[in-house]
Each structure stands twice: as C-alpha cells, then as structure tokens.
Amino acid sequence: MTRDSPDSNDSYKHINKNTTQKTSFDRNSFDYIVRSGLAGGISGSCAKTLIAPLDRIKILFQTSNPHYTKYTGSLIGLVEAAKHIWINDGVRGFFQGHSATLLRIFPYAAVKFVAYEQIRNTLIPSKEFESHWRRLVSGSLAGLCSVFITYPLDLVRVRLAYETEHKRVKLGRIIKKIYKEPASATLIKNDYIPNWFCHWCNFYRGYVPTVLGMIPYAGVSFFAHDLLHDVLKSPFFAPYSVLELSEDDELERVQKKQRRPLRTWAELISGGLAGMASQTAAYPFEIIRRRLQVSALSPKTMYDHKFQSISEIAHIIFKERGVRGFFVGLSIGYIKVTPMVACSFFVYERMKWNFGI
C-alpha cells in the first residue's frame, strides 16, 4: 500500500499535467482562429457539394430564366427541370458554377464560423451572459462579416449557374462581362469616384438585400442551432441524444469548456431545423438579391442600361406573381437547405472536436 500510493499519486500528477498542457488554449489565439476557420471552410465546402445540383435548379427558378419558368411552382417541375439539364448538359450541367461556389464558400464559411466564435466569445464570455438576443446578434454579425468579404464570388457563381446558352462557360469571361456592364448612374455622375471603382461595384449588385437578408438568416441559423442543442441536451433527451465520452475525453472537454457533442442523428436534426427556420426568415430578400444579380442580363434592362433598385425589383416581382413571387423556389429551398445546413453544422462540430478545439 505504502509503495503503491506514491506511484499512483505521481501517475495522476503526470496525467493531469500532460492533460493541462495539451488542453490549455486561448479562444482568441491565432491557433484557435486558424483551426476554427479550417473547420468552417471544410464544413461549408462539404455542404455545398452535397446540394450543388439543387442549388443550380433553384438559381434558375429564382432568376426567372426563360428556359425554366414553365417548371417553377411544383416538385414535379423540379424533376422536369432536372431532366432538362440532364438531356442538354449531362452531369456537368448540375455542377455548372460549382468551381466558383467552392472558391467562395470556403472563405465564406471560414470567416462566418471564425467571426461567430469570436463575437460569441466577446458577447458571451461566460454562462451568466448567455441570452437569446446575444446569440441572435452573434450570428447576424458573423453573417455580415462573411458576406462582405465573399460577395463578388457569389455574384460570379450566380451568373455561371444562370448561363444556359453555352455548353462550357469560362470563369474569366463571366468576370470580364460583369465588369464591362453599365455601372450605377449614381456613381458615374459623381466626379470624385474613379471609373474603375464604378464598374467594380457591379460585383456588388444585390448586396443591400443580401445584407438585409443575412441579418435574419445567419442570426436565426446560429440561434436556432444553439437553442436546439440546449433542448436535445436537456435531461429528457440527453440519454438518447448526447454522445458518450471516455473519462479522458470528458475531462478534456470540461477543461476546454467545449459543448457536449451530440450523436450524429441529433446533430443532423438540429442543423436541418435551424436551416429551415433561417431560410424562411430570409427568403424574400434572397429572391430580390438573385434578381438584382442578373438584372443586367434581363431583356427589359439590356438596352436601357438601368441599374435597378431594391424597390423597383420588389415591385416587378410583386407585379409578376404577387406575394407568392417572393417565395418562388422555397420548396426547393427547404429540400436543399435541410441537408446543407445539417451537413455544415455536423461537419463543423466534428472537425472542431478532431482539431482539439
């Protein structure tokens, strides 16, 4: 007994020391930011690749592409649109614009998750500061940060997906085309703004409704995900929904102040429901944004060189289809967003765990 006790104590101290060294970290450190950014970028890329075919069809519906307007409004139309793409372009047609999507989504998702972690850590430094509005604000601000940095790539992606006239659409040609399009008359009239900057602003067509839509979208997405995590970790669900950890993993989790990980099915459900809630809240703004992004290609604006405003686009949509016009493609949106957000949050949480953050 006397011989075993010191050994046991030494062993315990050794393990405890190693664990402390391994797990001590600063959430504001460069290492943490890089790891969380990498986890976010990978999760976003996985999610977007999963739903790329649905994303292509949704963009064609949202932008009222003349070749696809007859298919809108029903799930049967979705199948018919998919057949049309398959016959004309094959498998490649479903992934048209996907290279631009990946170029955009990796930095977008990386910035979004990093910003969320940092803003949340600032607004909610400890459990007593936890509140619904702080969660909502953290998500909204994270979304605004990411969309500002990556918006031009999103515009290019939409244009690539919108094109149906050419079998092979080149990224460089689309970028040149957007830059050479007529710039905003308001900017052109200002003598102090250089001409190149006016045309660069073409890459921010639809940016304002994007920002307006991002506030509810990102805010509701992160808020709903966190809220559902709380529900699924409640005493009623916890025995079925929370992943069982070994003693060492549990000790490490506590020291790092990590959330208890959910089982796969629970994580996917919380992510999917969060995505549906955020999609519903922000969808009208997304419709306006998509129409603004392709407004320069519309026959009605091709010759008068008019840079349309949000109110003008909203009026056109309402005149064409009424209130339903602001929710065109929402059923596809639900089909798309459920697996996308579920996959995104699931991969992010698992990547964080594997990266030791």
Curated annotation (Swiss-Prot):
UniProt GO MF annotations: coenzyme A transmembrane transporter activity
Compartment annotation: Mitochondrion inner membrane
Cellular component, GO annotation: mitochondrial inner membrane; mitochondrion
Principal localisation: mitochondrion
Entries under Gene3D superfamilies matching the protein: Mitochondrial carrier domain
Chain positions of Solcar repeats: 31-122, 130-231, 262-354
Regions that span the bilayer: 31-47, 103-119, 136-153, 208-228, 269-285, 325-347
InterPro entries tied to this protein: GDC-like, Mit_carrier, Mitochondrial_sb/sol_carrier, Mt_carrier_dom_sf
A GO biological process held by the record: mitochondrial coenzyme A transmembrane transport
Entry superkingdom: Eukaryota
Topology of this chain in the membrane: Multi-pass membrane protein
Pfam families, sorted: Mito_carr
Keywords, alphabetical: Membrane, Mitochondrion, Mitochondrion inner membrane, Repeat, Transmembrane, Transmembrane helix, Transport
Family of the protein in this entry: Belongs to the mitochondrial carrier (TC 2.A.29) family.
Role description: Required for the accumulation of coenzyme A in the mitochondrial matrix.
Name assigned to this protein: Mitochondrial carrier protein LEU5
